[in-house]
Amino acid sequence: MRTSGRAVIIDASSSGASGDKFLGALIDLGGSPKSLDKVARVVEDNLPGASHVHVKATRVERGEISAQLIEVRSEEKVSKRKASDLQSSAVKCAKELDLSEWGTAFVKSVLDTLSSAESRVHGHSVKEVELHELGSADTLVDIVGTAYLADELELSGARWWCGPVGVGTGVTEFSGRTYPNPAPAVAEILRSHKFPMKTSNIQFELTTPTGAAIAVNLADGKAGEIPIITPHKIGYGAGAKNLDEIANILRLTIGELSGTDHAHDEVVVLETNLDDVSGEVIGRAVERLMEAGARDVSITPVFMKKNRPGQLISVISDKTKSEHLAELLME
């Protein structure tokens, strides 16, 4: 549990969230572009089918605000990957980059969020779901890069908050089809995490699935109400497109929590009885629940009907993750 008085506020209310905007804002806060070069090399080495992965950082203006634009380029020999394959590559990247315990858990949780949303939208199991654009090298660079830069900036011990996430209207295209904004995966991520959403009249994909997944996992249940902080540093990440209506940026503000501001965590306890289940199955269930963001999982021996021995599995979860964890618990 993070107890530092240091806080990071994510402002994605006007122009949404995307992986490249998060990377840009972290670079603007002082992260090294060379760190992203390192992340790109590690992703290329550990993601089968990806080659020539490069990252370019450029200072640009969005609505007369100076911001960092991050562009990820790669060549792909495959058009889609299973979510489980991307997760496996991500774990290897985290290990090679020596991510902190928080960073490694964050990477896993973001990918779990993406695969869970895609599986619900398309009606496939998490194990069977295949990622198209979301399975590319740039998705992995966005997620692993965010964790790596947060570690570098010593933000892994900070408490993160996020206001409402801005989403556009109109339509967006991917996988050769047209979908309404926000994209179905974005809507599902925000719904399942009970995250506030702010709809604008801008006909553009302001928030991407990767951006939404990063935001909900960084905020870790702390969404909507922003605490009182003393700001110390501000970073701006630029979106790829320069929009006429708004400054297409994401803002990260680092500060200290006010001494009069007391943050309270709300948790949910999920429990179910298990009967005639092997220890191996229970062990794997505990592992999956922890990887998906449970705060704690415990197993208690109990007597069931007719004095049959069984187990009570108890899961402590943040409110925003409780629905997803309940679904895993029932699988």
Language-model segments: which ranges?
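Conserved phosphate/anionic-ligand binding catalytic regions in large, soluble enzymes, centered on
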Residues: 9-26, 131-154
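Mobile "lid/hinge" segments at catalytic clefts and subdomain interfaces of large enzymes
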Residues: 33-35, 155-261, 273
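Glycine-rich nucleotide/cofactor/substrate-binding loop typically near the N-terminus or early
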Residues: 28-122, 183, 190-197, 202-212, ...
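Extreme N-terminal starter segment of soluble prokaryotic enzymes
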Residues: 2-8
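Long, contiguous binding/interaction regions
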Residues: 19, 128-135, 139, 211, ...
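Short glycine-/aliphatic-rich beta-strand segments at the starts of folded cytosolic domains
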Residues: 264-276
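Acidic, glycine-rich active-site loops and adjacent beta-strand->loop/helix elements
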Residues: 13-14, 43-44, 135-137, 164-173, ...
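Flexible, glycine/charged-enriched surface loops at secondary-structure junctions
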Residues: 49-57, 101-107, 121-130, 157-162, ...
